[in-house]
């Protein structure tokens, strides 16, 4: 039973540290008044910078 508690605590720690489950507010610090998209921006938006990792900061053309 002690091992079970240890495994659950390690799983909980791993889920908190993983970048896929992080808060999107941190990404928005790098992208002012835009949206973060993984990879390239959609066709109707233009790239104005980068967010955290491989994400692109995208805005509408009239907001850039």
From Swiss-Prot:
Gene Ontology terms: cellular component: extracellular region
Keywords: Antibiotic, Antimicrobial, Defensin, Disulfide bond, Secreted, Signal
Disulfide bonds: 31-57, 36-51, 41-58
UniProt KW DNA repair keyword: no
Compartment(s) where it occurs, according to its Swiss-Prot or TrEMBL record: Secreted
An individual GO BP term: defense response to bacterium
Keyword Secreted listed: yes
Tissues expressed in: Expressed in circulating heterophil granulocytes and bone marrow (at protein level).
Source domain of life: Eukaryota
Extent of the signal sequence: 1-28
Main location: secreted
Protein family: Belongs to the beta-defensin family.
Biological role stated in the UniProt entry: Antibacterial activity against the Gram-positive bacterium Staphylococcus aureus.
Annotated protein name in UniProt: Antimicrobial peptide THP2
